[in-house]
Curated annotation (Swiss-Prot):
Disulfide bonds join C49-C52. It comes from Buchnera aphidicola subsp. Schizaphis graminum (strain Sg). One of its GO terms (molecular function) is oxidoreductase activity. Coiled coil: none annotated. Keywords: Disulfide bond, Redox-active center, Signal. This is Thiol:disulfide interchange protein DsbA. PROSITE patterns: THIOREDOXIN_1. Belongs to the thioredoxin family. DsbA subfamily. Pfam families: DSBA (PF01323). The keyword Repeat does not apply.
C-alpha cells in the first residue's frame, strides 16, 4: 500500500510540474489594444540597445526562436528606429535586406559588436563593408537589394507593424498579437535554465487564444 501511495504521489508531482501555467503580470502581460494582421511571434530589438546585445550574446535569442519554435509559426524579428537617431533607419534597412537574403544570423552579432564594443559603425559605407565581408554577398547583389522597391515596401510594413504596437522599449516580444514578454522582467524570474523556460513560455502563449 505504501509503495502504491509513493508511486501515485510521484505521478501527481510529475503531472503538476508538466501542467504548470505561467501567470499574467508575472512572466507576461496582456496588451489591452486589439492588434491584428501581425505575425504570431514578434520580436523587437535595436543594434543600439546594449541589453539586446547582451541577451543575444548570452542566449543566442534569434537562433533559439528559429530552431525551437514550430516552423509553421510565423516569426518576425523587427529592428526599431527609436534608438540611435537617423542612422537607426539605415540599420533597419540593412536588417530587412539581411532577412530577405536569409543571412541575418551572419550579420547580427558582427554589427552588434562593432556598435556596442568597437564603435566603428557611423556611416552607410561601414555597414556595407561589414555586410559584404560577413555574408560573402557581392556588391552588385547588395546594391540591387539596397535599391529594391520590394525592400522599400518591407520597410514600410516593418514600421507599420511597430506603430500598431506603439512600442517604446526593447527588447520585447509579442505573441499572438496580445501577450507581451518583457525580457528585463523575465531574466529576473528565470534565474536558471533561461533558454528552456523562455521557449516553454512562448509555446504556452502560442497555445492561448
Amino acid at each position: 500500500m505504501k509503495k502504491i501511495l509513493i508511486v501515485l504521489y510521484s505521478i501527481f508531482l510529475s503531472f503538476t510540474a508538466s501542467s504548470y501555467e505561467f501567470n499574467n503580470k508575472k512572466e507576461y502581460e496582456i496588451e489591452k489594444r486589439n492588434i491584428s494582421n501581425v505575425p504570431k511571434v514578434m520580436h523587437f530589438f535595436s543594434f543600439f540597445c546594449p541589453y539586446c546585445y547582451e541577451l543575444e550574446k548570452i542566449y543566442n535569442i534569434q537562433s533559439l526562436i528559429k530552431n525551437k519554435i514550430d516552423k509553421k509559426i510565423k516569426i518576425q524579428t523587427y529592428h526599431v528606429n527609436f534608438l540611435g537617431g537617423e542612422f537607426s533607419k539605415i540599420l533597419t534597412k540593412i536588417w530587412i535586406i539581411a532577412q530577405k537574403m536569409k543571412v541575418e544570423e551572419k550579420i547580427m552579432m558582427p554589427i552588434f559588436k562593432e556598435i556596442q564594443e568597437n564603435n566603428t559603425i557611423s556611416h552607410t559605407s561601414n555597414i556595407k563593408n561589414i555586410f559584404l565581408q560577413k555574408t560573402g554577398i557581392n556588391k552588385d547583389q547588395y546594391n540591387k537589394f539596397w535599391n529594391s522597391f520590394t525592400i522599400k515596401m518591407l520597410i514600410k510594413k516593418n514600421d507599420n507593424d511597430i506603430n500598431k504596437i506603439k512600442l517604446n522599449h526593447v527588447p520585447t516580444m509579442i505573441v499572438n498579437g496580445k501577450y507581451v514578454i518583457d525580457y528585463y522582467k523575465l531574466e529576473k524570474i528565470f534565474k536558471t535554465n533561461f533558454s528552456k523556460k523562455y521557449i516553454k513560455l512562448i509555446k504556452f502563449l502560442l497555445s492561448k487564444k
